Amino acid sequence: MLNKIQQRNSDIYSMTPFNFFEDFRRNLFNDLKSNLIKTDIHETDNEYVVEAELPGIPKEDIQVNYENGVLTISGQRQIDAAIEDEKGKLIHSERSLTSVRRQYLLENVKEDEIKASYSDGILKVTLPKDSNKEIKTSIPIE
């Protein structure tokens, strides 16, 4: 069974410059996707519920802010690469730093009633809707 390098070297098309750009594009977008917070947003008549995956990030390192109709979720996890523990000295790590941030436009919210909880790597933010705020759906053209 050929490994990835052997397959690439045996492929005649691997010598083209376009393959370099394809690999670059694939790696770039895979890296970007890995730092994107995966989210489900539910809407009812009374509230929005945002459930965001933040696995491995301690609760203390997660920030939730709401300002001007925008919910911002961010978090950071850092692993010290110089640690030596019962498993031995760490000689290779791909998990040294993770920093994520995402924003969501959720307007007409009762800002003082927003609640957040974190369990098993899932952040849940409940944003009650403010029914007193007027929502304008159409603007007349003069």
From Swiss-Prot:
GO cellular component: cytoplasm
Domain sHSP: 27-142
Subcellular location, record wording: Cytoplasm
Keyword Cytoplasm assigned: yes
CDD domains cross-referenced by the UniProt entry: ACD_LpsHSP_like (cd06471)
Keywords, in A-Z order: Cytoplasm, Plasmid, Stress response
Major localization listed first in the record, in broad terms: cytoplasm
Family: Belongs to the small heat shock protein (HSP20) family.
Name listed for the protein in its UniProt record: Heat shock protein HSP.16.4
Originating species: Streptococcus thermophilus
Lineage: Bacteria, Bacillati, Bacillota, Bacilli, Lactobacillales
